[in-house]
From Swiss-Prot:
Name recorded for this polypeptide: Serine/threonine-protein kinase Warts
Region (Disordered): 33-81, 145-253, 273-362, 383-462, 514-643, 881-900, 1038-1070
Quaternary structure, from the entry: Interacts with yki. Interacts with jub.
One annotated Gene Ontology cellular component of this protein: centrosome
Species of provenance: Drosophila melanogaster
Task of the protein: Negative regulator of Yorkie (Yki) in the Hippo/SWH (Sav/Wts/Hpo) signaling pathway that plays a pivotal role in organ size control and tumor suppression by restricting proliferation and promoting apoptosis. The core of this pathway is composed of a kinase cascade wherein Hippo (Hpo), in complex with its regulatory protein Salvador (Sav), phosphorylates and activates Warts (Wts) in complex with its regulatory protein Mats, which in turn phosphorylates and inactivates the Yorkie (Yki) oncoprotein.
EC id: 2.7.11.1
Taxonomic lineage: Eukaryota, Metazoa, Ecdysozoa, Arthropoda, Hexapoda
Listed InterPro entries: AGC-kinase_C, Kinase-like_dom_sf, LATS1-like_MobB, Prot_kinase_dom, Protein_kinase_ATP_BS, Rho-assoc_Ser/Thr_Kinase, Ser/Thr_kinase_AS
Domain Protein kinase: 719-1020
Positions with a binding annotation for ATP: I725, G726, V727, G728, A729, F730, G731, E732, V733, K749
GO BP, one annotated term: negative regulation of imaginal disc growth
UniProt feature, compositional bias: Polar residues: 33-54, 242-253, 325-343
Length: 1105
């Protein structure tokens, strides 16, 4: 026995007590406890004092805890008390004071200046720490603090004094028993000031129990809450590396030496308080509210080990309270501690009021939670949970989790209020529990994590009950999942039904649209067939119109199929839904997706049926249903149709662009010519500069007005019909006057489009318009306006009142040679003017030679004129034409009989060479050249053949190749060498006979290769060709008044009515007019139409502004 272990205050009777006291005395002589001084917070490391005087620093490896002595079974743990050091050792170098802390106990001095023999045996090599709270921070400078700040299961209250002080290094004063060094620092390193004393307990409780004696100030700092520890855990080996920075430092589930000493002394009643045998009652861990009389003690708290191992992740619950630990940043993902936040289940039954109890000797129960109990500041009362003693049959790991409810946050809160709230919550929970048992769980109830009820017994629930509760929770979760799956399936079914309804609605809209399109195609087809039949009846040898330019390739695939019942995609096969316009024609696609079926724009809402088949889509007009339009008048509807955008072939585009560019260039040239002509006239007259400037301004103003007038639309209502002049094969000629210029008369030639198209005269009409528009000389009838409407084409020309040459021939019979010489000379000049413009008239005859009021001639009727342009070629306007078609009179037809045909390049070269030749059979057979009839190619020399035939008719009185039928006439013209005879009774002069022989000859020997060859002939001796129009004509027609038409042949009224344009219905050409492009760029307006210059040559014609 150690000599220091002598008994103080009596020697115990039994052997066990003696051994315990002996061990305690050894501890007191081995360790010296340091105190934290209140003012001086500097920390002094604990050291060993050896016999040889050397002090070894106590490193963290020496902070060991002694294995506690096993108390007797009847002993119970006593509350923490402060044991003052014995008088024999206080103040000595080897003495010290004992401090209960979370770090450990250090020894500064040893009695008698030496280390005890048991020192080596009591210090293990490594500290065995609880593995769940191993941390990375060093623990040598921080002491144990309240578990409310460092434990995951602690309270989340924020009214701790740790958060209100700055950090100051703490220290321990060795040998200072009066210092308040027992106040532990916070985990974050903040220094703490000793808190004030707790509020006074209930006065009713003090009357029933013995009041505790006052605690001396020196030992107030040692008043501590119980530290969580377990004595039934197997020890774990701590890692050899540096410890973590967690402020929670346990003693491997064991008590520190001061706690062991306090518990053992309390169980043996070795330290009576106040010098009497009464036991000193420590301050209770709870705020006692209620008397101490007969109230049953509260049930023991559950096992801390079981609660640590049974914690789950937090989930939403109606009866859960989330208790979060402070975010100190020391818990890592690999920590074995409890997760935070922790679901704490509230017990359904009301809690019993805490009663003061007498600490009796009982079996040792491990303390699982410890917190600082302040004595100076008003702190909330924290909860201390004590783990009950585990039964020997069941292990601690299988115990169910029971966590007590948190106490009120502030001590001022009345216990009655808390009890009422707990009772109300318990009653609501009990009713809800009964309701849940009576009715199946609904899917809206969130899953419960922990056990929602706690049995009203002191013993923990058995393993079977725990497994039953878990099984019930699993079944409830499965039921909820099944109900959620059923709801999802129902929603999917509803969505599918809605999609099917939308698909059916879209299908109905598409069916109605397809039906409308089929009806429209049938109507178009009927109209096309009717027009083709009419055209075939009018001209059986003529080919029909071509089909629309864009055709669809689907003939049998236009059936509308029902859509597949997919969730999101609507597969609808509809050949009519193509892009507009389709270039090239869109092929049928079975996988075409109709994304706009619900927004197609159909407003009729008809529910059409599924179409089994439909006709082939020959023309795509639109991609969406035609909306219903307001009912308007027929005139407005016709006007609207005129501006509808229509599809045309590439030939139409080529035709339009060539004509448009040609007209633009022509307008520029004409404007430049007028400007230069004005400058020439002003320079010739010698006008002053100021006058020249004014003239130029007037010309520019005229040009601007002309451009505006060209854009103005014209119609026949702008003219007033006076009387008819003549009737032709395609229309009529009428004397008219313009409304705004009544002093000028015009001859308006009207051509019906239907007749032009039937007889394939589109190229001729186009050529006549171009010649009359470009001809700006005095030998050609001047064209002022040209325009069109839906049914007719209109030419507004200058009125020539003297009639035509044919009327004069009929009237006179045979011309005198002087009269014939005059008219032949003027005809020669007129033909030369046409040739200079690059045209060939090809229809020179007495009917097309007009005589004006002065007796001079003008050429007209340029319907058969050609300018060697592709727009003047009739083959271009032939229906169903293609690039592979060849002219029947092309030169390589001869090679097909005698040998192989020329190659493609040779044919192209020959075609280019033959471009200057004409191969069409046109004109009157009496006046046409033989090369034209033979289609061997002709040039402008063919017009001089016609001049020779007219001279023959003037002098002889009849055509040279007169016959009973046109076919006989044609044969005579071809065999002209045998059939051309000049009768001697005509008594023609030698010059006239020679000129006829020279003009009516073969093309290689004919006069006319140049106009000078003709003018230099002896027949024209004495004729001044330079001033022909200034000479007085030998014949002046008789004109009684400006509107006199007696010089023309009378018009048959029956013929006139049958050809009246106003009587035509217009249905014959309505469809063709919409699709035909030959009449583009037909409108024309001449410059200076209101002020016409006098008849002058081009060189002398001034520009009137």
């Amino acid at each position: 026995m150690h000599p220091a272990g002598e008994k103080r205050g009596g020697r115990p009777n039994d052997k066990y007590t003696a051994e315990a006291l002996e061990s305690i005395k050894q501890d007191l002589t081995r360790f010296e406890v340091q105190n934290n001084h209140r003012n001086n917070q500097n920390y002094t490391p604990l050291r060993y004092t050896a016999t040889n005087g050397r002090n070894d620093a106590l490193t963290p490896d020496y902070h060991h805890a002694k294995q506690p002595m096993e108390p007797p079974p009847s002993a119970s743990p006593a509350p923490d008390v402060v044991i003052p050091p014995p008088p024999a050792i206080v103040g000595q170098p080897g003495a010290g004071s004992i401090s209960v802390s979370g770090v450990g106990v250090g020894v500064v001095g040893v009695a008698n200046g030496r280390v005890p023999k048991m020192m080596t045996a009591l210090m293990p090599n490594k500290l065995i720490r609880k593995p769940s709270i191993e941390r990375d921070t060093a623990s040598s400078h921080y002491l144990r603090c309240s578990p409310a700040l460092d434990s995951g299961a602690g309270s989340s209250r924020s009214d701790s004094p740790h958060s209100h002080h700055t950090h100051q290094p703490s220290s321990r004063t060795v040998g200072n028993p009066g210092g308040n060094g027992g106040f532990s620092p916070s985990p974050s390193g903040f220094s703490e000031v000793a808190p004030p004393a707790p509020p006074p307990r209930n006065p009713t409780a003090c009357s029933a129990a013995t009041p505790p004696p006052p605690v001396p100030p020196t030992s107030q700092a040692y008043v501590k809450r119980r530290s969580p520890a377990l004595n039934n855990r197997p020890p774990a080996i701590a890692p050899p590396t540096q410890r973590g920075n967690s402020p929670v430092i346990t003693q491997n589930g064991l008590k520190n030496p001061q706690q062991q000493l306090t518990q053992q002394l309390k169980s043996l009643n070795l330290y009576p308080g106040g010098g009497s045998g009464a036991v000193v009652e420590p301050p209770p861990p709870y705020l006692i509210q209620g008397g101490a009389g007969g109230a049953a003690p509260p049930p023991p708290p559950p096992s801390y080990t079981a609660s640590m191992q049974s914690r789950q992740s937090p989930t939403q619950s109606q009866q859960s309270d989330y208790r979060k630990s402070p975010s100190s940043g020391i818990y890592s993902a690999t920590s074995a501690g409890s997760p935070s936040p922790i679901t704490v289940s509230l017990p359904p039954a009301p809690l019993a009021k805490p009663q003061p109890r007498v600490y009796q000797a009982r079996s040792q129960q491990p303390i699982i939670m410890q917190s600082v109990k302040s004595t100076q500041v008003q702190k909330p009362v924290l909860q201390t949970a004590v783990a009950p003693q585990s039964p020997s049959s069941a292990s601690a790991s299988n115990s169910p989790v029971h966590v007590l409810a948190a106490p009120p946050s502030y001590p001022q809160k009345s216990a009655a209020v808390v009890q009422q709230q707990q009772q109300a919550a318990a009653a609501a929970h009990q009713q809800q529990h009964q309701h849940q048992q009576s009715k199946p769980p609904t899917p809206t109830t969130p899953p419960l994590v922990g056990l929602n009820s706690k049995p009203n017994c002191l013993e923990p629930p058995s393993y079977a009950k725990s497994m039953q509760a878990k099984a019930a929770t699993v079944v409830q979760q499965q039921q909820q999942q099944q109900q959620q799956q059923q709801q999802v399936q129902q929603q999917q079914v509803q969505q599918q039904q809605q999609q099917q309804q939308q698909q059916l609605q879209a299908l109905r809209v598409l069916q109605a649209q397809a039906q409308r399109e089929r009806d429209q195609r049938e109507r178009d087809q009927r109209e096309r067939e009717r027009d083709q039949q009419k055209l075939a009846n009018g001209n059986p040898g003529r080919q029909m119109l071509p089909p629309p330019p864009y055709q669809s390739n689907n003939n049998n695939n236009s059936e509308i199929k029902p859509p597949s019942c997919n969730n999101n995609n609507i597969q609808i096969s509809n050949s009519n839904l193509a892009t507009t316009p389709p270039i090239p024609p869109a092929k049928y696609n079975n996988n075409s997706s109709n994304t706009g079926a619900n927004s197609s724009g159909g407003s009729n809402g008809s529910t059409g049926t599924t179409a089994s088949s439909s006709t082939s889509c020959k023309k795509i007009k639109h991609a969406s249903p035609i909306p219903e339009r307001k009912k308007i008048s027929k005139e407005k509807e016709e006007e609207r149709k005129e501006f509808r955008i229509r599809q045309y072939s590439p030939q139409a585009f080529k035709f339009f662009m060539e004509q448009h560019i040609e007209n633009v260039i022509k307008s520029y040239r004409q404007r430049t010519y007028r400007k230069n002509q004005l400058e020439k006239e002003m320079h010739k007259v010698g006008l002053p500069d100021q006058t020249q400037i004014e003239m130029r301004k007037m010309l520019n103003q005229k040009e601007s007005n002309y451009i505006r007038l060209k854009r103005a639309k014209m119609d026949k209502s702008m003219f007033v019909k006076l009387k008819p002049i003549g009737v032709g094969a395609f229309g009529e000629v009428t004397l008219v006057s313009k409304i705004d210029t009544s002093n000028h008369l015009y001859a308006m030639k009207t051509l019906r489009k239907a007749d032009v198209l039937k007889r394939n005269q589109v190229a001729h009409v186009k050529a006549e318009r171009d010649i009359l528009a470009e001809a700006d000389n005095n030998w050609v009838v001047k064209l002022y306006y040209s325009f069109q409407d839906k049914d007719n084409l209109y030419f507004v020309m200058d009125y020539i009142p003297g009639g035509d040459l044919m009327s004069l021939l009929i009237k006179l019979g045979i011309f005198e040679e002087e009269l014939a010489r005059f008219y032949i000379a003027e005809v020669t000049c007129a033909v030369d003017s046409v040739h200079k413009m690059g045209f060939i008239h090809r229809d020179i005859k007495p009917d097309n030679i007009l005589i004006d009021r002065d007796g001079h001639i003008k050429l007209t009727d340029f319907g058969l004129c050609t300018g060697f342009r592709w727009t003047h070629n009739s083959k271009y306007y032939q229906e169903n034409g293609n690039h592979s078609r060849q002219d029947s009179m092309e030169p390589w037809e001869e090679y097909s009989e005698n040998g192989p045909k020329p190659t493609v390049l040779e044919r192209r070269r020959m075609r280019d060479h033959q471009r200057v030749l004409a191969h069409s059979l046109v004109g009157t057979p009496n006046y046409i050249a033989p090369e034209v009839l033979e289609r061997s190619g002709y040039t402008q020399l063919c017009d001089y053949w016609s001049v020779g035939v007219i001279l023959y008719e003037m002098l002889v009185g009849q055509p040279p190749f007169l016959a009973n039928s046109p076919l006989e006439t044609q044969q005579k013209v071809i065999n002209w060498e045998k059939t051309l005879h000049i009768p001697p009774q005509a008594e023609l002069s030698r010059e006239a006979t020679d000129l006829i022989r020279r003009l009516c000859a073969s093309a290689d020997k004919r006069l006319g290769k140049s106009v000078d060859e003709v003018k230099s002939h002896d027949f024209f001796k004495g004729i001044d060709f330079a001033d022909m129009r200034k000479q007085k004509a030998p014949y002046i027609p008789e004109i009684k008044h400006p509107t006199d038409t007696s010089n023309f042949d009378p018009v048959d009224p029956e013929k006139l009515r049958s050809n009246d344009s106003t009587m035509s219905s217009g249905d014959d050409v309505d469809q063709n007019d919409r699709t035909f492009h030959g009449f583009f760029e037909f409108t024309f307006r001449r410059f200076f139409d209101d002020k016409q210059p006098p008849d002058m040559t081009d060189d002398q014609a001034p520009v009137y502004v």
